[in-house]
Amino acid sequence: MNHNTSFQQQLLQQLHQPGGSNPGGVGATGAGNNSPSYPEASLMGSKFWQKQMQLAQLSRQTGPTSHGYARAAAINSRQQHGRDGAQVDADKDQGPSQLTLVDLAVQTVQQDLVEQQQATAASTPQRGYTNQQKKDQLEEERQMTLMQQEKHQYWADLDMSGQGLMCLSPPLFRSYEFLLKLYINHNKLTTLPPAIRSLRQLRVLDVSSNMLTKLPPEIGMLHNLRYLFAFDNYLSTLPHQVGQLYQLEVIGLEGNPINQPIKEKLAQGGTKELVAELRESAPMPAAPKPREWIVLEEAGGRGGAATAAAATEGESGSTVATATAGANAAAAGASASSDTFTVMSYNTLCDKYTTVQMHGYTPLWALGWKHRSETLLKEVIGYDSDILCFQEVDGASFEDFWSPKLHQLGYAGLYHPKTRARTMSKEKDAKRVDGCAIFYKTKSFCLIEKLSLDFSSLALKNNDFKKTADTYNRVLNKDNIALIALLEHVTTGQKIIVTNTHLHWDPAFNDVKLIQVALLLDEVEKFAERVAKDSNRVSARNQDGNNVKYESGKKLPLVICGDFNSTTDSGVYSLFSQGTVTNHKDMSGRAYGKFTDEGMNHGFTLKSAYSNIGELAFTNYTPNFVDVIDYVWYSSNALSVRGLLGGIDPDYTSNMVGFPSVHYPSDHISLLAEFSFKKQKGGDGQPKKALDFGNSGSHSGSRKT
């Protein structure tokens, strides 16, 4: 028998059980609840509103029972396994199973999916769902979540239905953040506390048949919510924050005096269109406070960039002064001294990755490239950094947007796409592949040399890298890259190696990220040694001999920027900061020859610029991931950090599901650090005096690559 038919028969049978035939159900008798609404003729033909009526009727019929969901689960479990836990013979009639509101909602979503597939691919036969395929996807998600948690939580559903509850204590929500399903239907609740925002793992929320007059705005923070049942309350409208529930499949509103525009939108397009309408029509959120500029007094401060407002102690022991920064505070500080410069690292979020499926909490107009590019450019101009390291820049935006816009501002740029761009047969497709870009101010730096790196090629050529199954299955099939620029500081003659990279994203491949960094640092070391040996080299900008010599490559100023997709407890962070990694958990069970047998190391003295303040709260802000994965590494023996751009206003993020948002155009935030050169000996054993080239001919010695 077709499962859809049997499912409908079960529903009809259950609805006609005693107490189920009354169209008013519990809605008419439960304390304070509305009676069901009788839809206008204009709604009767809507399949979406018919499903609302069907779901609401089942809610009224099954809801009055105390702990109705828990009882249904127990009944269904006994039918499946028997009272003694033994598997029951499927051929024997065990009686009807207990259908819940969630079961019916999941079934309607699956039916809609099948209809959509049939409509878009009519020529492809579509098989009906088998019993195995119809397993509740919410339960599958629950099992996956439980397996991934370090502290195993063996239950994730809470049923408090039919208890006559008049209020809920906020600690309930803060203590049960792991909940996936919460049933508080058929009570006497008049409000939901704002603390409900804590339940960010929630997939199902049933608040039907209460006395709610409104839903709290904080409900918009429940970004994992799939099913929201609010039948038979006193809701006349919905907060616009419901528009942030981009994964919502079903919202139940029948039995509420809901306003006509919401009712019509739900009847015409269903839940998805209603959520989209609320998202797109939401008012502009309040602008965040400006990011603060943090002055590292240990390095001598930033001449007059800002007045210190407060002092705190960083993890490294250095005292930092915090001051509110204007849009161009970094540039103001850098210009105060001839031996300082600023570096920005920014994953700008490639346009092709901005999908509704990934970022459905953001209005479409704010997700579009026009708005994001304008906001990105405004931010870059405001901070006026001397060196820019961008990740996730596709070829088209580099050529058509970034290069011409930044050229007008006095920058020259370099670009290297990910390796898959070379496999594209069409130039248009190749230009959609993202990569890394480096821009530098030609009045501050001139380009000596550039080097492009492909990690898969480096692994293939490296003799210490054993060609194992892990090598072929995990490393060689990744297309991540790095870009290196050797720059010379115009006023001091100091050379600096600027490196920009974007490592593999998947947390299941932390070993690959560590290998990629080891390969990168090995290449940078070889590059630096070659530059040091050739330190008598004089650029077109320094014909009068303002040239600095370096005893070895490790003495060269070095900055490595990027999206490393690695947290501070990762092997990547350890290798950078400690100079060596052996037996790290990220490499557990992997075989990469000497890289795993003897560990990995480098000879630089590297430090994260933001480690001077204990790192930021986050650099990547998405619904299911908020952490630090972007860094600006520098050679602490050759450079000093003078200042850092602070984090995002926490009051702003407390109301944001994730980035990008109207005000922040990427899911990453920009990092900005001000450095000063430590003194290096010149050819005569003394530091050379900085040259003043003025404004004339400021572009003559640079070349754009």
Curated annotation (Swiss-Prot):
GO terms for biological process: DNA replication; DNA replication checkpoint signaling; nuclear-transcribed mRNA poly(A) tail shortening; positive regulation of transcription elongation by RNA polymerase II; transcription elongation by RNA polymerase II; traversing start control point of mitotic cell cycle. Residues 15-42, 75-94, 117-137, 679-705 are annotated as: Disordered. Residues 119-132, 695-705 have a biased composition (Polar residues). It comes from Yarrowia lipolytica (strain CLIB 122 / E 150) (Yeast). Residues 81-94 have a biased composition (Basic and acidic residues). SMART domains: LRR_TYP. This is CCR4-Not complex 3'-5'-exoribonuclease subunit Ccr4. LRR repeats lie at residues 152-175, 178-199, 201-222, 224-245, 247-267. It holds the Pfam family Exo_endo_phos. Its cofactor is Mg(2+). The keyword Transcription regulation applies. Residues 21-30 have a biased composition (Gly residues). Belongs to the CCR4/nocturin family. Keywords: Activator, Cytoplasm, Exonuclease, Hydrolase, Leucine-rich repeat, Magnesium, Metal-binding, Nuclease, Nucleus, Repeat, Repressor, RNA-binding, Transcription, Transcription regulation. The keyword Transcription regulation applies. Mg(2+) binds at E392. It catalyses: Exonucleolytic cleavage of poly(A) to 5'-AMP.
